[in-house]
Curated annotation (Swiss-Prot):
HAMAP family assigned to the protein according to its UniProt record, in alphabetical order: Ribosomal_uS17_B
Protein name: Small ribosomal subunit protein uS17
Family, similarity comment: Belongs to the universal ribosomal protein uS17 family.
GO biological process, one term: translation
Pfam families: Ribosomal_S17
Keyword DNA-binding: no
Cell cycle listed as a keyword: no
Subunit structure: Part of the 30S ribosomal subunit.
GO-annotated cellular components: cytosolic small ribosomal subunit
Family annotation (PROSITE patterns): RIBOSOMAL_S17
InterPro entries: NA-bd_OB-fold, Ribosomal_uS17, Ribosomal_uS17_bact/chlr, Ribosomal_uS17_CS
SUPFAM superfamilies: Nucleic acid-binding proteins
Function noted in UniProt: One of the primary rRNA binding proteins, it binds specifically to the 5'-end of 16S ribosomal RNA.
Length: 87
């Protein structure tokens, strides 16, 4: 049961919500260059399961690792941290 507590939790921005019950989340991380010490930005996109289609493009969301839900989905939506500002 302790395995359940070791799941990855990531925070990112929704870049696509065109699929039904699926969102694409862009997660940006910073790593320090091993030799020069400069912080370098890395970004990766994850597909996440959004059961009720609550997340929209531009929202900041929290996703959690889960069992494989499809060929590419390995995460599910936990909560919408911040709604996007519509201009």
């Amino acid at each position: 049961m302790s395995e359940r507590n070791n799941r990855k939790v990531l925070v990112g921005r929704v870049v696509s919500d065109k699929m039904d019950k699926t969102i694409t989340v862009l997660v940006e991380t910073y790593k320090k260059h091993p030799l020069y010490g400069k912080r370098v930005k890395y970004s990766k996109k994850y597909k996440a399961h959004d059961e009720n289609n609550v997340a929209k493009v531009g929202d900041i969301v929290k996703i959690m690792e889960t069992r494989p839900l499809s060929a590419t989905k390995r995460f599910r939506l936990v909560e919408v941290v911040e709604k996007a500002v519509i201009v």
